[in-house]
């Protein structure tokens, strides 16, 4: 029997419902339970795949090829479960499926309404996503009081009635602000948020109160009194330097035990020693390395959320504080590579469109010519190919057909056909819809013997997640290989280039996939760990060169 924990948010958005949900999931998992997490998004887009990163942040890709909310990235980084397309759905997806059923005649001519048809569809999708788990944590996007969230809130209200309070639990996350002018903590916003939730028919069982500093006991008692929530169920969650501390903070306040008690679950004590090790390693680095992330969405760091976390994970596993310098590629076009002079390593992430492309190419050229560690991810690998073709293979004006359809040397072109993991042949052509038509999800990759990639992974075949519709042009690969480009990874059917390296460079790697999606704080990822180690080595080499003249003078 699956138990359901519904997590809602009040007062303001961006309080951290996703991280709180994931942290509770980590606690329950440590107590011996199988856990899954769902994210319900109230926007009308079918999925976030075609949304601007500036509006939505990162699009997280699941193993089965779904383009989902970035919170699913938090879920996978905190719990061992692998998310699927069933773990995230939107209002748009719900309405699309209901309308499809209506057109098919499934409702026998009935009038289609929000209640019961939309709410019933939401409940069906929640149950499908939760299937097989001991506990399903269901995060409802948006803020209580938003019109968009009402069908989701009504659906979970109905699930409480249908399943009872031994199988369902409501957790409400609110803001408890500190007003500096008055020198007081204000509980009134939380009181009103709970009042709004109760007017919908939902009484929260547990409150998680977000604040700058830990809540005093007197304020917790006051909140409990005015919200009808028992005082032990009012949890204080103040700001922390590392999100990986949160499972420990919530565990120490007894949140996992309270949940198990209310849901009548017999569970063991939560052993979070691995999280303690993660936090200790992050707080006590022995080295520092500076990484330039050269992109076009740098004004919103959530656009590269999994990427920044993967670099932090690599730092944890190399005892290194990773300083991330986000550099707009258009700024490099304007001011040149002087912006890269002080960094120890360069990373060019994925992206779409022609804006800022030449700045990324300059960054790749700077890394190649100066022996600086380079990691190109997805578009970043394609950028490295274009730069190499132009400046090493004498292919003047080489480009991707995404940016220049008439380029004389189309070293990167549209992927028209590939074999999916299940052996199914997928096909695409110009003019297809943008949504959901890329090469998506986990795909197997065969690594070249004696390559850097093979040494980093320690195996000859890996599965990594993809999100792209352009690939390296096989017709021109031979010419590039003659000039020193190493194809270190290929798709299992040998049709697509998955990884590249440079034989005469200390550490230069490109991958068509997104390794950041499978990096976790407890395990890291071999490519990022290798990248940070290379950055440290480059930093030490630079220091040695700078120290050499002064040593000669001393002698």
UniProtKB/Swiss-Prot annotation:
Keyword Iron: no
Annotated keywords: ATP-binding, Glutamine amidotransferase, Ligase, Magnesium, Metal-binding, Nucleotide-binding, Pyrimidine biosynthesis
Enzyme Commission number(s) of this protein: 6.3.4.2
GO cellular component, one term: cytosol
Domain Glutamine amidotransferase type-1: 290-541
UniProt binding sites for L-glutamine: 351, 379-382, 402, 469
Activity control summary: Allosterically activated by GTP, when glutamine is the substrate; GTP has no effect on the reaction when ammonia is the substrate. The allosteric effector GTP functions by stabilizing the protein conformation that binds the tetrahedral intermediate(s) formed during glutamine hydrolysis. Inhibited by the product CTP, via allosteric rather than competitive inhibition.
Region (Amidoligase domain): 1-265
A Pfam family reported for this protein in Swiss-Prot or TrEMBL: GATase
Reactions mediated catalytically: UTP + L-glutamine + ATP + H2O = CTP + L-glutamate + ADP + phosphate + 2 H(+); L-glutamine + H2O = L-glutamate + NH4(+); UTP + NH4(+) + ATP = CTP + ADP + phosphate + 2 H(+)
The protein's assembly and partners: Homotetramer.
Family affiliation: Belongs to the CTP synthase family.
Protein name per UniProt: CTP synthase
Source organism of the structure: Coxiella burnetii (strain Dugway 5J108-111)
């Amino acid at each position: 029997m699956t138990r359901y924990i519904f997590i809602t948010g009040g007062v303001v958005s961006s309080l951290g419902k996703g991280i709180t949900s994931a942290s509770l999931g980590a606690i329950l998992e440590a107590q011996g339970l199988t856990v899954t997490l769902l994210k319900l998004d109230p926007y009308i887009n079918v999925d976030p795949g075609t949304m601007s990163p500036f509006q939505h942040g990162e699009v997280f890709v699941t193993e089965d090829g779904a383009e989902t909310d970035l919170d699913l990235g938090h879920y996978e980084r905190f719990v061992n479960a692998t998310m699927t397309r069933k773990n995230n759905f939107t209002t748009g997806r719900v309405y699309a499926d209901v309308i499809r059923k209506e057109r098919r005649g499934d409702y026998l001519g009935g009038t289609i309404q929000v209640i019961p048809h939309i709410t019933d569809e939401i409940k069906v999708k929640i149950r499908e996503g939760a299937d097989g788990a001991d506990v399903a944590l269901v995060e409802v996007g948006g803020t209580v009081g938003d019109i968009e969230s009402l069908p989701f809130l009504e659906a979970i209200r109905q699930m409480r009635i249908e399943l009872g309070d031994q199988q369902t639990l409501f957790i409400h996350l609110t803001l408890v602000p500190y007003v500096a002018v008055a020198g007081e903590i204000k509980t009134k916003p939380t009181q009103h948020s709970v009042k709004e939730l109760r007017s919908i028919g939902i009484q929260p069982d547990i409150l998680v109160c977000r604040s700058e500093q830990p809540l005093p006991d007197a304020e917790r008692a006051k909140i409990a009194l005015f919200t009808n929530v028992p005082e032990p169920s009012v949890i204080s969650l103040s700001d922390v330097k590392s999100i990986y501390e949160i499972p420990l903070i919530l565990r120490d306040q007894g949140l996992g035990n309270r949940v198990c008690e209310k849901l009548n679950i017999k569970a063991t004590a939560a052993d979070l020693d691995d999280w303690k090790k993660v936090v200790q390693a992050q707080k006590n680095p022995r080295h520092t390395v500076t990484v330039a992330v050269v992109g076009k969405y740098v004004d919103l760091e959530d656009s590269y959320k999994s990427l920044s976390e993967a670099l932090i994970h690599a730092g944890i596993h190399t005892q290194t504080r990773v300083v991330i310098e986000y550099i707009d590629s258009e700024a490099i076009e304007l001011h040149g590579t002087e912006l890269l002079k002080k960094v120890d390593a360069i990373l060019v992430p994925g992206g779409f469109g022609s804006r800022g492309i030449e700045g990324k190419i300059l960054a790749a050229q700077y890394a190649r010519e100066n022996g600086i560690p380079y990691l190109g991810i997805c578009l970043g690998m394609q950028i490295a190919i274009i730069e190499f073709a132009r400046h090493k293979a004498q292919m003047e004006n080489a480009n991707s057909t995404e940016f220049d359809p008439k380029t004389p040397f189309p070293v990167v072109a549209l992927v028209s056909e590939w074999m999916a993991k299940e052996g199914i042949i997928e096909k695409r052509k110009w003019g297809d819809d943008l949504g959901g038509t890329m090469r998506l999800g986990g795909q197997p990759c065969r690594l070249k013997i004696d390559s850097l990639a093979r040494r980093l992974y320690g195996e000859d075949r890996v599965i990594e997640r993809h999100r792209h519709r352009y690939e390296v042009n096989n017709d021109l690969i031979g010419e590039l290989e003659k000039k020193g480009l190493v194809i270190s990874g290929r798709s299992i059917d040998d049709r697509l280039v998955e990884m590249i390296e440079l034989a005469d460079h200390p550490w230069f790697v490109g991958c068509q996939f997104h390794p950041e999606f499978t990096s976790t704080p407890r395990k890291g990822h071999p490519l990022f760990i290798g990248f940070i180690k290379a950055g440290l080595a480059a930093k030490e080499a630079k220091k040695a060169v700078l120290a050499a003249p002064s040593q000669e003078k001393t002698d």
